[in-house]
Regions:
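Conserved catalytic or regulatory cores that recognize and/or transform ribose-phosphate-containing ligands
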Residues: 1-142
Length: 142
C-alpha cells in the first residue's frame, strides 16, 4: 500500500527532513511513501504526460499527504484529484508557515507541526486511526 506525498517541486530539497519524517511515520504503519517529484523528471513540453502520470500515481495510492509548508499549484491539483477519487487527504504544514485555506478546507485530517519529530508523532497517530479503514483504492472501469 502506498501514500502519495505531495510537495512543492521547487522547494523539495528544503523539505528533506519533513519528507523523511512523513516516510518514517508511514513505514511504522506498513505504508510506503511515494514522492512524485523524486520519481520522475519531465521537460516543459511534457506537461500532459506529467499530469497524466501524476493522476495515475494518485489513483494507485490509499491516501495523499499534502506537505504545504511551501505552497505549490501542483499540490492543489493533486489534492483536488485525490478528493474527486475519494482518496483521504492529510494536510501537513509547519506552524510557522502560511495557512493554505484551499488545501486545509478540502483535507480530511490536519497536522500542524513544530519540527520533524513532532510531525512524525502527530502523523503516526492519524495513520493509526486510519489503518482500520485502509483499503487499496480501486479504479473504476466502465
Amino acid at each position: 500500500m502506498q501514500a502519495y506525498i505531495s510537495i512543492s517541486f521547487s522547494k523539495r530539497k528544503e523539505l528533506e527532513k519533513e519528507v523523511q519524517a512523513i516516510k518514517n511515520a508511514l513505514q511504522k504503519c506498513g505504508v510506503s511513501g511515494f514522492v512524485f517529484v523524486d520519481e520522475y523528471q519531465f521537460s516543459a513540453k511534457q506537461e500532459k504526460k506529467m499530469m497524466q502520470k501524476a493522476m495515475e500515481d494518485v489513483e494507485k495510492s490509499a491516501i495523499l499527504i499534502a506537505e504545504v509548508s511551501e505552497k505549490g499549484i501542483g499540490i492543489g491539483i493533486e489534492v483536488g484529484y485525490a478528493k474527486a477519487k475519494n482518496i483521504p487527504v492529510i494536510y501537513v504544514r509547519n506552524s510557522k508557515s502560511e495557512h493554505s485555506t484551499t488545501v486545509s478546507g478540502i483535507a480530511d485530517f490536519r497536522v500542524i507541526y513544530e519540527n520533524e519529530i513532532d510531525l512524525e508523532e502527530k502523523l503516526e497517530k492519524i495513520l493509526k486511526t486510519l489503518s482500520v479503514s485502509f483499503k487499496p483504492h480501486q479504479t473504476r472501469t466502465n
